[in-house]
Amino acid sequence: EIFVRPRGPTKNRGMAPRAQTGGDTARPALDDLAYVQKDDVLVVDGYNIIFAWPELKKIAADNLDAARAALVHSLCNYQGMRGCRVILVFDAYPMKGNPAAGDKEAGVEVVYTKEGETADAYIEKLSYELGKSHRVKVATGDALEQIMVLGHGAQRLSARELKWEMEQVRGHMDGYLHKKS
């Protein structure tokens, strides 16, 4: 034998290898929303989500403003149930002379980037700054953007994961309203 430890060769202690889990990962139940902190921030890449979700993509094909409004409405419900701050970022960089603009629609902060600035660049800076004092989640379907925000300490949500979370919140909200009536 080339290498033998000082106390003899390594022995098999009868431990079984860990079981492989399937593709589904367990998620926390949304019945108990206590794991959400008030200083949580969700940053959403607006157009990326619109064109990743079939129902919003269909609306956007006819009317982009209506698709943006539908996303804001969905995020408003999500924010109300989760109690977190939501920042929705849209690209506005191709518009000549466009200053950065922000507005609050139904509690959701909506940001249009300034001329020459992409939503990705804005989200990277925002996640870095907010990450110093908040728990930040960034929702985007852009894999490169997900890697960048992970580097800043933010959590990432794919478009599919955000949709799943929003459906869970919607179901929780419907159940809550049903109990009240």
Residue ranges and their predicted role:
Residues E1-I2, K11, P17-G23, A29-V44, ...:
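Nuclease catalytic cores that cleave nucleic-acid phosphodiester bonds
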